[in-house]
């Protein structure tokens, strides 16, 4: 009995690893975490030298801290009517969809959006539970929500939440203020809150100023980082005075007044329905604290937006917009003027940065507005964490306003939205990237001890290693080339367990269907990230108008040809945008892998097009540019031929273009069209229109364009000399679908790429004395010989087929071939999916026998197959695919234990 339990435990453990061990799942990402140890503390320091070490007293202290944090703190009332001239308010057209009863479709969508594998609330019911039983309980859930609205309150359990404390990175854990409270709320409550959040967020872009970048679709944290970096740079380059005021609100989400939230909702004309729902959600909210594995007593909440509540971020944004309005309407607060563009304020939720002209009046008025907002909202300005830095021509100033406030003046370096800044922009990249390689190496060393395939290591590289750098790579100038080279070396050394690349780097980065494994190319990765800024620059009208004003030439990249990049680079001093241009130029130099068609070039730009030259120079006519004559199609008739000069004058009246100038331009265009039509075009790179089609479609398409070439894996040249007409695309895809087990996937991949070590290879490397087969000891051991040509292996395959025929009378009659054994099902030769698995398991069994230097025997193979099928069954039961498993193996009950299948 005990041995059976142990065997079952081993099987379930293997199934867990196969299912999640090399994928970006919660199980995988938690393998190297020490969450419990990280979330425990042996003592607390009250800050006055008083240490608390007894666990019961620690829990009481934590409860007291949060009970006090969420206690009622009367906020002052203030008439906000004076702000309405600056504000955009909701009207009936905006609010129609905010009212009405909660619908089942809203709840269903909220449930779909909920992630699995998340900690439940106090009642213990998970999102998976609700998803499984929603067809049965959904209608009752919706009724309960609408009944709660009628009664004006929720049930007792729906109000409950457990506050779990997460320590802030890099801050001493013995101080309770350095822990972040996250509320674990019941899923039923979160579904209701999500429905209301879904309604509210649809109107936020209407009322929330573009200076706020938090929690709204189409707004991006990087825009605030970009604004800060470019402001520091331009004030420095153009000798403009400026002052940065970086405000820190203490526990902002947790201390905002409920009275103020209601007042803000009314100010923006939210309907009574939404205001009533807000009151219902917060009316009897109560929590306990989970700390050091213990739970405190329950206590009521009287203020704050609970972190973990789906509606909280949106309620906070509405409150923060009041502050934004107060600052923008105060004309005594003057921002920094950069190239006729005024920069004053940027926010990301509670992260607030003011860009001031440096005058005392602007500073004191800004502080005045902040203090008034603090009094009416319940938020407290954390003076000893609020940082102020002189920038531009004032960066060496010693002036300090309001010294009694104890603000941090001239902090040297300061952190905003995850990026470390300095008033000297040439230091910013070094500050952020120094030490990152050591951090990457430490992460790799933690994973190096695990026996993982390169497929699993690719997952680690993408999710846990490069992710440490992504935020920096998107928002800062590129790190030095030596940094990237060392990073690339470290990553690939980890991937292959040494310096030898067993498969070419360029092949590893390709898609599965092209013989690759979606490995990350760090250089292409950075290009893809940086190119995203060009998409943002062109697709969101108004959002990035700051950069359209600061760097107007950048907005013309999409309408001009590739010859425009070099003039732009000469005129731009910003290292970040210069890097963006260089990556764009790299994208434009991608080689074509298909012939040009005439229709391809109609969308091509006329100006700065390297393929359309007049007197060996690219064309740029300012009148044509101003009149929107930008693309080849703009000077073609309906038959695709160039317009005559008279037709051109009719289409573009009052033109200043002379007949001679027009003839010169049109001859250049006509020559390009004729060359394309006749197949004489020597265009080697992708077209500008193709590049922008990819940029507009998203990062995935940019990445695909960068990988666009006709290179094939080296091993295919050898295989193609041995086999005719193999469908490699089918073979590649099949190898990744043949098994959920990453070990078996990689085993098959090593065969395809001819990197599975045979004795012939080991002998060449002087790692073995003989190249002869471990089974027959008479022929050189190659892949062909090991899996097919060897007499012992041939005998093994015959025994397997014989066993199949004898014990599985209804299974497919299979004619084995060398291609089938080596590569699996190449075409739709048979529909029996179990055969694929049997052949793969058997082939892997042969390989294990080779390593153990024993002859492959059918009885041992059948035992191995039973074990693997049992693991498959466990996997099927965990993923809800038991019926699929049974359909796959039903014909083989005679060969294996019927109980297994």
Identify what each model region corresponds to.
Residues 1-65, 100-157, 163, 233-241, ...:
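Short, charged alpha-helical motifs in flexible N/C-terminal segments and linkers
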Residues 32, 70, 94-322, 326, ...:
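Conserved pre-catalytic core of RNA-dependent polymerases
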Residues 86, 293, 381-412:
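Short, conserved micro-motifs composed of acidic
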Residues 121, 160-163, 180, 212-214, ...:
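Catalytic palm active-site di-aspartate
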Residues 172, 266, 402-405, 411, ...:
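Family-specific functional microsites
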Residues 405-478, 531-543:
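Basic, alpha-helical interaction scaffolds
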Residues 487, 500-757, 854, 864-901:
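Extended C-terminal regions of large enzymes
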